Swiss-Prot record:
Residues 1-25 form the signal peptide. Residues 125-308 form the FAD-binding PCMH-type domain. It comes from the Eukaryota. One of its GO terms (molecular function) is FAD binding. Its EC number is 1.-.-.-. GO terms for biological process: indole alkaloid biosynthetic process. Pathway: Alkaloid biosynthesis; ergot alkaloid biosynthesis. This is FAD-linked oxidoreductase easE. The keyword Oxidoreductase applies. The keyword Lyase does not apply. Its cofactor is FAD. It comes from Trichophyton verrucosum (strain HKI 0517).
Amino acid sequence: MQFLLWSTGLVALLSWLIYTQETQSASCRCRPWESCWPSEELWNSFNTSVDGKLHRLRPAAHVCYGPSFNRSACDNILLLSRDSGWRASNPGVLQDWVWEAGETANESCPVGSLRTASAVNSCHQGRIPLFTVGVESTKQVQEAVRFARKHKLRLVIRNTGHDLAGRSSAPDSFQIHTHRLQEIQFHADMRLDGSNTSLGPAVTVGAGVMMGDLYAQAARHGYMVLGGDCPTVGVVGGFLQGGGISDFLSLNQGFGVDNVLEYEVVTADGELVVANALQNQDLFWALRGGGGGTFGVVTRATMRVFPDVPVVISEILLEAPQAISSSWTQGLSIVLTALQSLNHDNVGGQLVIAVLPNLAVQASIKFFFLDATEAAVIDRRMKPFLTKLSRANVKYTYSSKNLPHFSSNYRQVPDIHSDNDYGVLGSTVAISQQLFDSPQGPEKVAKALANLPVSAGDLIFTSNLGGRVIRNGELAETSMHPAWRSASQLINYVHTVEPSIEGRAKARERLTNTQMPMLYALDPNIKLSYRNVGDPNEKDFQQIYWGPNYGRLSNIKKKWDTDDLFFSKLGVGSERWDSEESDEVYFFSYFYLEGINTLKVARR
């Protein structure tokens, strides 16, 4: 009798599983080998609807391999591969090879010496999408979204390809490339439709505009813009939807999302909507920190701009033969104490530590004295800190310069990649004001940075928070983790990756299991990371990125995107999908004779 009951239960369970497999298979993304994949006729029809902007996509380096080999074209690719601007505009390449390659050595198409280093003799698609639409209008974005939804394609939203967690690519995917949406329009007195309330000067920016281009245009209009320091990062993509931390200006002006006034978004049903404080307020809240590529395709955004002002920049340079030494640690402690002190006077600064090929270390800390015009005055203000360095026998060099406009500080030249073909992975941890402003705070941070195991080529740098970031907590309603409003500094760690699949796996393991636990242990008051530069293996991403806001974000996601057309790695709702977000993850339980047990997660 017991066997009969067990057998009956097992048959019922298997029948239920088969039913689930059949009825829920439509939830998974369609792959090229499946019957659901669009026919050539459908692709051609779609291409007509987007004015011929659809292209079959091959990795940019395919001209260096096999039947596609072309010597002059390959040499040109090798030359261009160091140009970040070229990488931003080319949909078949990312800013870093790490997320171009698949999980095995035969799933990549590397450029340059990577070909030898990874022993790849042929070109494979890897994580580069199969098709791309180089959209030039919101209508084309709408058509692309509707096509992806209708055919259940794995959709990737890509702007400049800077994402360090692999969100700009995915295997067997369909890409919307927003880089050609290049609108820049300034408003002397911004007002939302239906409102007479003045919001001050602002700029409307298309999804494809890069930081350097916006800075240049803003300078011509007498403005400075809160943004990142890399000129080829897109303004409106992950930066302005994931938080928008400015290394230099967040102390004085807050986060990028604090200063967004309006988004224009193509939603999962292909509709174009406006989200601001007066309409679609839930979507507006979610986009202000909920992460890019998650709630829709943002085609443009409007954000505040600020009067361009003069600035004096002072810089202290330190150098040591090795990171673990008392003199190096003491030097870091002194310059971080200077940062602590000057932050109280709204003077922002940034510390950058570089590990040289011989494992010697260099540090540069710059301070930005806004509205200052005389370098000599600032030099006198910096003298007490320089005296401390001298008394501690720390070798340093000091310089200062005054610029008539802060916007002049931004680089107006293309980013140049190193020629060693190494990739990078990165992550971040926030340091609370409670720790950093304590008497021992700078020393504790200095010791943690000095003791962190590093490799040649690694970078560690800080981003200045505090100040307006904290004060905006009472003013700006954003979806960022509330703990940001008590954070003083952000520590960014960029780890080099050897040019091989094995090197990538080793780097990811070391980042997740060694370096990040050490950095998180620095401040027990806060466990917080910046999603835009977060560990791609982060297990507790919901809490670490959004904390108590995650539940509301998840509900808004379900409202605006019921089928999860938009998703990104470690994004809102991504826990419902597998690691490449192509197959849904199902949890189910069954009754066993001895009680209730939970089966293992089944992936299809």
